[in-house]
Amino acid sequence: MDTPPPTTPRTEPTDADVEAFKQQLGRPPRGLRAIAHRCPCGQPDVVETAPRLPDGTPFPTLYYLTCPKANSAIGTLEANGVMKEMTERLAADPELAAAYRAAHEDYIRRRDEIEELRNFPSAGGMPDRVKCLHVLVAHSLAAGPGVNPLGDEALAMLPQWWRKGPCVTPPGDEPATSKEDDR
């Protein structure tokens, strides 16, 4: 797969971004801080969330993948045993394990720059195992290539989820309806 091109790093969410998020996940955002990556279609596909939700609940997932097309494709990888295979490789390959630990440290550093969550792990199983490819891919998209080796690897396995168009209808692009359509 050709990976999505890098986009302007971390942008403030617009009203249209918040609406896209609501359409993507079927709920309003919680703890939304920024758009961490945009899909080639222009919609947000990774958001940066606060380390604590508005009610104070710790939320260790800094980068949250929002695109339902990407989420579905990653779910297929998970169902096909990719996480188990990656975890086995971590145990057998010290260089991969060291690079994955560095990805974990990067994730924690970025989260702690916002607010330190003591005694909370990073996400996705880092640094010792692979528990959630969604988190690893979100980290790779937000941080860029070369930071999370297993996120980069999973991203390379994905089809071009954006190729057939946006996962949601951008605000203002809804198809026009006539009075006949309303009957």
Where are these regions (language model features)?
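Preference for intrinsically disordered or flexible, low-complexity segments
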Residues: 2-183
